[in-house]
Amino acid sequence: MNSQNMSIISLVLQASWVVQLVMLLLVTVSVASWAAIFRKLFALKRVKALNEEFEREFWSGTSLNDLYASAAQNAKQAGPMERIFASGMREYQKLRERRITDPGTLLDGARRAMRASFQREMDVVESSLSFLASVGSVSPYVGLFGTVWGIMHAFTGFAGMEQVTLATVAPGIAEALVATAIGLFAAIPAVIAYNNFARDIDRVATHQETFIEEFSNILQRNLGTQPGGPTASGH
């Protein structure tokens, strides 16, 4: 390669096929990680908005019966917190239909149903995080592999030369280092996004766990004071 022609494109085109394959893999992974980042960004924004909307409705004084009916009617558009609430109410009503009247049994059943629903919701919210973590941790090493291979390939080409100068070494080393640069380009955004998403998801989880405890307290109060239970009263 001409030492004066060391643009990124020329370095990629002049690299060995193994290094080019590594670069292609890293670029593909980078594109996939950016797609995952934007999907997760919009998904988390929607989750937060739906949870806030339901929580406002929940604390507005609307009866639990009406909230449950609304959640059942709009199940596909409901947010995680609303589905958690609906699962607790559904289990409570099933136990009541079986003529179970013990407050402890009713409360425990509703709480277990909400915890199970909470875990399902968190599995959905946390999806693709492992992919971003893998991209962030593995990409630099894949890029390093491409660099090492490229340097070995460059040194092999120097073996037949009588005199090796910086001008002859630089292009081969530069094209090998491009693989490391692409690996870092793929890894850094993935790591930053992973850390931000993990923090936001922890907040969502804490918020939903707090709601479960608050709703459980409401059920407990109503079970202790209302003959008809929470379906017969507000909160």
Predicted feature residues:
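Alpha-helical transmembrane segments
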Residues: V27-V47, L144, I151, A186-I201
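Predominantly long cytosolic amphipathic alpha-helical stalk/bundle segments
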Residues: A49-V142, W149-T165, I192-H235
